[in-house]
A protein has these predicted regions:
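Short, Lys/Arg-enriched N-terminal segment that forms or immediately precedes the first helix
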Residues: 2-18
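Amphipathic alpha-helical dimerization/coiled-coil segments
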Residues: 9-13, 96-105
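N-terminal helix-turn-helix DNA-binding core of bacterial DNA-binding proteins
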Residues: 13-50
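Residues within the DNA-recognition helix of helix-turn-helix
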Residues: 57-60
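C-terminal flanking helix
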Residues: 62-69
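Beta-hairpin "wing" of winged helix-turn-helix
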Residues: 69-84
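Basic, amphipathic "hinge/linker" alpha-helix immediately C-terminal to the N-terminal HTH DNA-binding motif
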Residues: 81-99
Length: 105
């Protein structure tokens, strides 16, 4: 991906929130899209972010932000069937559509 393509991809995210979209939101989104589903621990290790940063970011990109505001609805969390205390993250239908549009750039 060249810089023009990167700019186009980032513009797709800017539409969601032109004034407030931390770069680690984009990083988390891209890792989840690439791996299909991941644990919080995997995201922490790959992106060198704290558990609280991952948790807040995933919530903001989910259905409801932690402060009760509507989220971006790009990610879904669900209990890991193999380990009930662990949560997995995957792209929502809206997130999959955005991921496909970025892949086509």
């Amino acid at each position: 991906m060249d810089l023009r393509q990167l700019g186009t991809a980032l513009a797709a995210f800017a539409v969601l929130s032109p004034t407030h979209l931390p770069i680690h939101f984009v990083q988390i989104f891209l890792v989840v899209g690439e791996k299909k589903q991941v644990t919080f621990q995997e995201l922490m290790g790959e992106l060198n972010l704290t558990n609280s940063a991952i948790s807040r970011s995933v919530m903001a990109m989910g259905e409801t932000h932690r402060k009760g505001k509507p989220g971006f609805e790009l990610l879904e969390t669900f209990k890991d069937p193999a380990e009930g205390r662990r949560f997995l993250v995957r792209l929502s239908p809206k997130g999959r559509a955005l991921y496909r549009s970025i892949q086509s750039i």
